[in-house]
Amino acid sequence: MNAALATTTATTPVLRRETPLLHYCSLTTKSPVYQINRVRFGSCVQTVSKKFLKISASSQSASAAVNVTADASIPKEMKAWVYSDYGGVDVLKLESNIVVPEIKEDQVLIKVVAAALNPVDAKRRQGKFKATDSPLPTVPGYDVAGVVVKVGSAVKDLKEGDEVYANVSEKALEGPKQFGSLAEYTAVEEKLLALKPKNIDFAQAAGLPLAIETADEGLVRTEFSAGKSILVLNGAGGVGSLVIQLAKHVYGASKVAATASTEKLELVRSLGADLAIDYTKENIEDLPDKYDVVFDAIGMCDKAVKVIKEGGKVVALTGAVTPPGFRFVVTSNGDVLKKLNPYIESGKVKPVVDPKGPFPFSRVADAFSYLETNHATGKVVVYPIP
């Protein structure tokens, strides 16, 4: 999930291919004629704004009491999951002699307590972004929750002992960190971090950063506001589950509809969906209502554009764009987490952690295998990390 927004106007459709980039297009139509196969859009104007984005029920509870002290002796070496070649899950190796990263003046060193996996982790490991990736070998992982054990000289607000969470790579695909969160320690810039919400544990916190930043930025870029309606495709996924909650409980949506499989309909209702749609039985193109925004978190943009109102907007998590559309790379920003912390602490927004987890640190390869089935509910979390 990533983003680099650009603004353009044209009368041809935006098409997409599979990619973890987040896309945004504003569709304004005088006559809503949408026949994707024939590329006939009536009178259609598509806008893609340019800007960097930030790129997500209850979990099996991890203990909130974590015995980490700020003045603990920091070892020279640590355990970490590493891959030295691109490929399948089998390239992942648990190493015990990885050097603990040195911090820069604007960074803190975090003793990692929990981490989470995202689809972009798998695609990166498969080599789909090798042109812009950091050099191998790689310690994967974007999402982290843990305790600050060392601070750089230019760090202003954080101190040793603070419990924090973040997406550790400012840009998920453009030179992401070589040493990510699937390790005992990781170095993170202060600007990417926020204090962990007090009411959730580390495992729950680890499941939030990349997904909730993606969800929020999509809503911001579509100018979503009180009184508007939204349809979320894949409402039980890591990002979709948070889009439902933010739209309903933070932005004041007049109506939230969401698709899910039969067994997950009650979950999306519990998160705030007014209408839960069983995608195994219903076709969204046949829905009687149109929506101000469609948030496509599954890769069905061709159908998404058929259920928006005149002037409505679509956010797509998968697919690339042919001109005049533009991809935009989601970037991490601790300010987004700080903005949303009050809603998390009030219980209005809840982390959704897949019930098959958390996976212990020794089973990271199994966690990836499960993630790549594309059947996870919410986020796949790794906890505890020794």
UniProtKB/Swiss-Prot annotation:
It comes from the Eukaryota. Its EC number is 1.3.1.-. Keywords: Chloroplast, NAD, Oxidoreductase, Plastid, Transit peptide. It is an enzyme of class 1 (oxidoreductase). GO terms for cellular component: apoplast; chloroplast; chloroplast envelope; chloroplast stroma; nucleus; stromule; thylakoid. GO terms for biological process: response to cold. Its main location: plastid. GO terms for molecular function: 2-alkenal reductase (NADPH) activity; enone reductase activity; zinc ion binding. It is found in: Plastid, Chloroplast. Gene3D superfamilies: Medium-chain alcohol dehydrogenases, catalytic domain, NAD(P)-binding Rossmann-like Domain. Disulfide bonds: none annotated. Optimum pH is 6.0-6.5. Disruption phenotype: No visible phenotype under normal conditions, but enhanced susceptibility to methyl viologen. Belongs to the zinc-containing alcohol dehydrogenase family. Quinone oxidoreductase subfamily. Reduces the double bond in short-chain unsaturated carbonyls. Acts preferentially on alpha,beta-unsaturated ketones rather on alpha,beta-unsaturated aldehydes. Has no activity with (E)-2-hexenal and (E)-2-pentenal. Contributes to detoxify stromal reactive carbonyls produced under oxidative stress. This is NADPH-dependent alkenal/one oxidoreductase, chloroplastic.
